[in-house]
Amino acid sequence: MPRKNNRNSYNYRNIERDVRDIQRAGKRFKKSWINADGPLERILILLVVVAVIGVTIGMLLPKVNPTVGEITGEYTATGTAAETLEKLTVDDNPSKAGYDRDAFGFRETDDDGNGCYVREDVLARDLTDVQYKNGRSCQVASGTLDDPYTGQTIQFVRGVKTSSAVQIDHVVALENAWQSGANTWDHAKLYQFGNDMYNLLAVDGPANQQKGSASAAYWLPTNSEYRCDYVARQIGVKDKYGLTVTLQEKRAMLSVLHGCPAQELPES
């Protein structure tokens, strides 16, 4: 949550007092106006009252403004996530022409050389109580997922009908990456992105399907406590690979970061 700024804090009693001052000024104006002898005196009275009300309102607005700012998101997020977001290029004319998911080679590389595809590495990293197939294989047979997207606990059991309960999500979706600049990459960089564990999470299968290729402008985790981390990771991925954001996407990210202004980028 954003830290409160004492300099911008205000007191309802002070506001009520200022409002009463305006009301009293209005009553004095009405009485003086009735008792005024001529047009010139009435004009002078009007100018004085307008000046008094203007000064009072001027003193009142700064006290109210912080709450308005919090409601509209005018205060500034200052963590590394927000700072990095400001550096990303905005492109409101992305093209998904030529998009091919297979071009990213997901699950076809073994970058760490442990003999396991990246899906198994992500499951082993993100699940707890992990059991491996045959006790020795790198294939995860079962485990428990504390799902970041829904906040639910999911039991993973490998099987034709059960494996899909836990899926591996590209936090920045492959299609979104393609539209954001990946369409210019060579084969090696596409494979690097498609299998980068920094951009991969084990998550609830239905939530992953619901998200599809949506950016933060169109989809956020239902688990509100994870949204700051989710957006920060998307920003980190886009910064790492020089990808762009749309203006609507950027605004959605900033809206989330206003609830956690000191949010840092994930390191791994």
Regions found by a protein language model. Name each.
Residues 140, 149-268:
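Domain-level detector of nuclease and nuclease-like folds
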Residues 27-49:
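N-terminal Sec-pathway targeting helices
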Residues 11-14, 21, 73, 77-80, ...:
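Non-membrane alpha-helical secondary structure
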Residues 42-62:
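Hydrophobic membrane-insertion alpha-helices, especially the h-region
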Residues 69-148, 152-153, 159:
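Cell wall/extracellular polymer interaction/catalysis modules
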Residues 1-30:
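N-terminal targeting leaders characterized by basic, low-complexity, disordered sequences
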